[in-house]
Regions:
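Short, basic, helix/turn surface patches
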Residues: 1, 5-11, 110-118, 144-159
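Active-site C-terminal subdomain of aminotransferase-like
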Residues: 2-103
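Generic, ordered loop/turn and secondary-structure boundary motif
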Residues: 9-10, 28, 36, 55, ...
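Solvent-exposed alpha-helical segments within well-ordered globular domains of core cellular machineries
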Residues: 25, 75, 110-113, 159, ...
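Intrinsically disordered or highly flexible coil/loop and linker segments, enriched in small
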Residues: 36, 40, 60, 79, ...
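PLP-dependent enzyme catalytic core of the Aspartate aminotransferase-like
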Residues: 68, 131-197
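Generic non-transmembrane alpha-helical segments
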Residues: 72, 76-80, 107-115, 164
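Conserved PLP-binding catalytic core of the aspartate aminotransferase-like
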Residues: 83-148, 194-197
Length: 197
């Protein structure tokens, strides 16, 4: 099993490999020293903190909310007329297939940036466009969930996306995005130090 420690684990930028003991020596030999340099103690400490938080009940609630938010966003996008690869999502990610529209992934990414929504262009299976243009956009829900967004908020995000890629008025959509972010500030109640126990 391979994974990153950033993204859904919300830790430092790194990765890890889990394997059975019988494969450990081969994995270690393949990774170090050729692919991995010396250990960075601050990154090791950050990983330890990330794994400690991931073992908590609160983190499980966070992960469940990520999934619920992903379903809400996927539903809103599809209800707004956008096509999703695989017809929805079964994790925290989804990819909008723009081939039936006039949008390229790049143009959609730029348009959504105008209404303060960050996505990234992505190729879709059998994409005829080059990767820098692409025919899709990829979205995920961990960051907004960490910020406190719930299913209702993600339905609004879906409406903002479909509006921006449709006939929506950009100034009005931008104002709605601002209102949503004001409702869910980045660091509500932050006192200048973390509280992990």
């Amino acid at each position: 099993v391979t994974s990153t420690t950033h993204k859904t684990l919300a830790g430092p930028r790194a990765g890890f490999i889990l394997c059975r003991e019988e494969h450990a020596q081969a994995v270690d030999k393949a990774v170090f020293p050729g692919m991995q340099g010396g250990p960075l103690l601050h990154v090791i400490a950050a990983k330890a903190t990330c794994f400690k938080i991931a073992a908590s009940a609160a983190f499980r609630v966070y992960q469940e909310q990520i999934r619920a938010n992903a379903d809400a966003l996927a539903d809103a996008l599809q209800e707004g007329g956008l096509d999703l690869l695989s017809g929805g999502t079964d994790n925290h990610l989804m990819q909008v297939d723009l081939r039936r529209s006039d949008w390229t992934g790049r143009a959609a990414e730029e348009r959504l940036h105008e209404v303060k929504i960050t996505v990234n262009r992505n190729t879709v299976p059998f994409d005829e466009r080059p990767p820098m243009e692409a025919s899709g956009i990829r979205l995920g829900t961990p960051a907004v969930t960490m910020r406190g967004f719930d299913e209702g908020d993600l339905r609004e995000v879906g409406a903002l996306i479909t509006g921006a890629l449709g006939e929506g008025e950009l100034d009005a959509l931008r104002a709605r995005a601002d209102a949503l972010c004001e409702k869910r500030p980045l660091y509500p109640g932050y006192r200048g130090y973390p509280e992990y126990r």
